[in-house]
Amino acid sequence: MDERLFTFAGLINPNHDFIIGFHTLLVAVILLILARYATHKMQVVPSGIQNVFEFIISGIISFAKDIVGEQVARKYFPLAATIAFLVFFGNAIGIIPGFEAPTSSWSFTLVLALVVFFYYHFEGIRAQGVLKYFKHFMGPVWWLAPLMFPVEIISHFSRIISLSFRLFGNIKGDDMFLLVMLMLAPWIVPVAPFAILTFMALLQAFVFMILTYVYIHGAVVVDEEH
């Protein structure tokens, strides 16, 4: 018998796809409400939730520009930050008893990985042109092309698996960890495990965001040696 955590959505429909879809929609609504609230009455001197969001935004851009440069960090911030917030809240909602993290479903993480995969290729082709972009797949010298091209293709497709399974595996493991802790101490609020899971939720969102930036940077920045 499949042992599953209780969820409020499961009371409506026990189907797993419905539960994941319900929590995905819930996370999206929460993000929209927060974004609306933060930008409803914007002030020159920020305060409250506007101050929190501006601190987070400036922190993300500041960190990303050290890795991919300021131009890429700012230009692709909307996509990278949206994914980061979606992943974080998608992870964090599963920590609350009665809710399930949509990121614990491989279908959810696969969609995010595919969005990043197709987007960075699209941006790479738009920035460099089709021929020049795929020329980078051929290697530094023409006679290495038969070897380098399939290696590059496999490398790029492996990013889909890497992005989706890393997030899925970690959050699925967190769910099992939470299940075990609640079985061992159902009447005691496990503060330490919840703190660990919150940190892991933040870490996974950060990793996904940085990899998104790195993949886009690798696609759009022209290598002068080629």
Swiss-Prot record:
Keywords: ATP synthesis, Cell inner membrane, Cell membrane, CF(0), Hydrogen ion transport, Ion transport, Membrane, Transmembrane, Transmembrane helix, Transport. The chain crosses the membrane at residues 18-38, 44-64, 79-99, 105-125, 137-157, 177-197, 202-222. GO terms for cellular component: plasma membrane; proton-transporting ATP synthase complex. Belongs to the ATPase A chain family. NCBIfam families: ATP_synt_6_or_A, PRK05815.2-3. F-type ATPases have 2 components, CF(1) - the catalytic core - and CF(0) - the membrane proton channel. CF(1) has five subunits: alpha(3), beta(3), gamma(1), delta(1), epsilon(1). CF(0) has three main subunits: a(1), b(2) and c(9-12). The alpha and beta chains form an alternating ring which encloses part of the gamma chain. CF(1) is attached to CF(0) by a central stalk formed by the gamma and epsilon chains, while a peripheral stalk is formed by the delta and b chains. PANTHER family: ATP SYNTHASE SUBUNIT A, CHLOROPLASTIC. This is ATP synthase subunit a. The gene is atpB.
